[in-house]
């Protein structure tokens, strides 16, 4: 892995002033810069704009196009307010580089790898460029194993692959960010894993809430910051498209160091991968490229592949990536979510219908998929239980029109039994979360895979047909459901 001994590309003091250009044009966050003949910077090089005289205007840009006539077009990583034509621009001679390693844990960074949490500078001289090629095929690890999350609906019906890529699909307000926070919490506590969280183009308030939640739950250790389990990298909604487009790569670069150098298993969370595409679309238009379907950039598949192919498992360690995917207007055929689908090992689809019923997590058990749900990987018992649950829920879905028109009484005895079990299963798929204790009033539950399988087997077998369906709502394992049923009877 290529490591640069310098600090962030934005700090001018570390840059030799050997290649100077001047701004000739500014269009919002895009700058055209002229350089002397024969001194053109490479694509992806970081450029730093210097203020005139005593002005402190250190704006870092990234070269995106070579225009000819000794000019390049670059995209700014921060606001371009105050920039003027004629200002001096320094070519740093390398891509943006960010700090990596254990000292990044417990800290919040921006796209340039600068800490933004007011806790002082990062104690490391080890940095890494955000642009690098994906691992070679010969380095990849191809073993298949399940990554247990402690969330019943996920582990049973759409299990995650260790070192795989998982998509959380859903419209606005159905619980993607809460699910991501719960996964970070469970993974830190149950697996002791290191996580990197990339906040790409989401709300600043959510980033702040997540940080405070992590401090409360001990994922970030305030007393001893290096003992923390997560590094946070934020490029929020209010930032220019250049920052939102590159913040995912900054987070990935930090995760790659833990995988390749520290040889650890890492969790990379990206919230939200759609905003990465959206930022690319904005930049593409500013660079003058012709838009393709639905106004997206023509390079959509290439950009997505460039990011996703670096998220993989090698013989040294693994990166398991969980990516929230906002689905515009709940349309799964939109080019952004459709392009993301191609790279995923598992999909967790959140349903507005389930959220409306108050069933959280609102994971759709029929739409969510996983390449891991095969008998040779998960075992016959798990596979048959999951298949039985899906068949029961599918039959319930088919019967809903008849129930709506004619009522339950018109169904056959067998169908009435199927409906009763399906409603119990639907409620048992809900679960109280640690990070949502404030909303649910119930303490969070981590449910192991064996317990999950046992619970659903009991419902499918008919052993629990006599229990009321509300006993299965917002509980952990099946023993809690039977205890709750006893309380309801008294």
Swiss-Prot record:
Domain of life of the source: Eukaryota
GO molecular function terms attached to this record: ATP binding; ATP hydrolysis activity; proton-transporting ATP synthase activity, rotational mechanism
Major subcellular location class: plastid
Documented EC number(s): 7.1.2.2
Enzyme class name: translocase
Membrane protein topology class: Peripheral membrane protein
GO biological process: proton motive force-driven mitochondrial ATP synthesis
PANTHER family in the record: ATP SYNTHASE, ATP SYNTHASE SUBUNIT BETA, MITOCHONDRIAL
Similarity comment: family membership: Belongs to the ATPase alpha/beta chains family.
Protein name per its UniProtKB record: ATP synthase subunit beta, chloroplastic
Origin species: Ipomoea batatas (Sweet potato)
């Amino acid at each position: 892995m290529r490591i640069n001994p310098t600090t962030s590309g934005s700090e001018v003091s570390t840059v030799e002033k050997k290649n100077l250009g001047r701004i000739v044009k500014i269009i919002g966050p895009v700058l055209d810069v002229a350089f002397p003949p024969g001194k053109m910077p490479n694509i992806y090089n970081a450029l730093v704009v210097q203020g005139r005289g005593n002005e402190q205007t250190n704006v870092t840009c990234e070269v995106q196009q070579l225009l000819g006539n000794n000019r390049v077009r670059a995209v700014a990583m921060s606001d371009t307010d105050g920039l003027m034509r004629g200002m001096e621009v320094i070519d740093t001679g390398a891509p943006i580089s960010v700090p990596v390693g254990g000292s990044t844990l417990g800290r919040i960074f921006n796209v340039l790898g600068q800490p933004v949490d007011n806790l002082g500078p990062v104690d490391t001289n080890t940095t890494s460029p955000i642009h690098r090629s994906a691992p070679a095929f010969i380095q990849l690890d191809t073993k298949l194993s399940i990554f247990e999350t402690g969330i019943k609906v996920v582990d049973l019906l759409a299990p995650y692959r260790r070192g795989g890529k998982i998509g959380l699909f859903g419209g606005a307000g159905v619980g993607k960010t809460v699910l991501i926070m719960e996964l970070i919490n469970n993974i830190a506590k149950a697996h002791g894993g290191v996580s990197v969280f990339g906040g790409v183009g989401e709300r600043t308030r959510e980033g702040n809430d997540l940080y405070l939640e992590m401090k409360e739950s001990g994922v970030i250790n305030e007393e001893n910051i290096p003992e923390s389990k997560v590094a946070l990298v934020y490029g929020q909604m209010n930032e220019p498209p250049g920052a939102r487009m590159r913040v995912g790569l900054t987070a990935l670069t930090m995760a790659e160091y833990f995988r390749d150098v520290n040889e650890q298993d890492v969790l990379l969370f990206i919230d939200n991968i759609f905003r990465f595409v959206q930022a690319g679309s904005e930049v593409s238009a500013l660079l003058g490229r012709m838009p393709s379907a639905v106004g997206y950039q023509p390079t959509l598949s290439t950009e997505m592949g460039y990011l996703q192919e670096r998220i993989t498992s090698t013989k040294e360690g693994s990166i398991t990536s969980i990516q929230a995917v906002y689905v515009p207007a709940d349309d799964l055929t939109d080019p952004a979510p459709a392009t993301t689908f191609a790279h995923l090992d598992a999909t967790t689809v959140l349903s507005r219908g389930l959220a409306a019923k108050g069933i959280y997590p609102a994971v759709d058990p029929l739409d969510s998929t996983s390449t891991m749900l095969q008998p040779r990987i998960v075992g016959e018992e798990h596979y048959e239980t999951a298949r039985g649950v899906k068949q029961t829920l599918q039959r319930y879905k088919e019967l809903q029109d008849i129930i709506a028109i004619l009522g339950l009484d018109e169904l056959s005895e067998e169908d009435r039994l199927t409906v009763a079990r399906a409603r119990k299963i639907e409620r048992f798929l809900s679960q109280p979360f640690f990070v949502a204790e404030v909303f649910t009033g119930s303490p969070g539950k981590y449910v192991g895979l064996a317990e999950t399988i046992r619970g659903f087997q009991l419902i499918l077998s008919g052993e629990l047909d006599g229990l009321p369906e509300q006993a299965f709502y917002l509980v952990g394992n099946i023993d809690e459901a039977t205890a709750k049923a006893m309380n309801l009877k008294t």
